[in-house]
């Protein structure tokens, strides 16, 4: 099965109450929207939580494309994480990587799946990205 996923995270204050949202679309164009919230978090933690939760809904043998408007998420999972692992989870400036717990969880999940990561510009009219944004924002208040 093939899936396309759009994810987003939001925070009211940083840190503060946060929400995440994901739009999951299968190859038959069936769409599932999921979202959640945390009372005290950061926008980056919500950006990481969204794909973790979305991937938990999909069988491991699926082919997946994930769209995110977060360069932190896309670059972290496709570029930076290899160096973090090599450097004992230290960033380029030798400080501990923030959100290590979520990066470890996301890395474990993504290694078990065929995933292509793509960046999409935020608030640029992409309907599914806008839906993910709305889900994340609305989750904060629900």
Label each residue range with its predicted role.
Residues 1-45, 49, 53-60, 134-142:
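RNase H-like nuclease fold core
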Residues 10-17, 53-131, 135, 140:
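RNase H catalytic domain
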């Amino acid at each position: 099965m093939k899936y396309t996923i759009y994810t987003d995270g939001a925070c009211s204050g940083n840190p503060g109450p946060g929400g995440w949202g994901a739009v999951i679309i299968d190859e038959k164009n069936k769409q599932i929207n999921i979202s959640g919230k945390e009372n005290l978090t950061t926008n980056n933690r919500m950006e990481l939580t969204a794909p973790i939760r979305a991937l938990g809904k999909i069988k491991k043998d699926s082919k997946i494309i994930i769209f995110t408007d977060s360069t932190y998420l896309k670059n972290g999972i496709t570029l930076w994480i290899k160096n973090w692992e090599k450097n004992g989870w230290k960033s380029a400036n030798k400080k501990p990587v923030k959100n290590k717990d979520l990066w470890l969880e996301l890395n474990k999940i993504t290694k078990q799946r065929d995933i292509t990561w793509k960046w999409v510009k935020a608030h640029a009219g992409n309907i599914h990205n806008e839906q993910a944004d709305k889900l994340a924002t609305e989750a904060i208040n629900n």
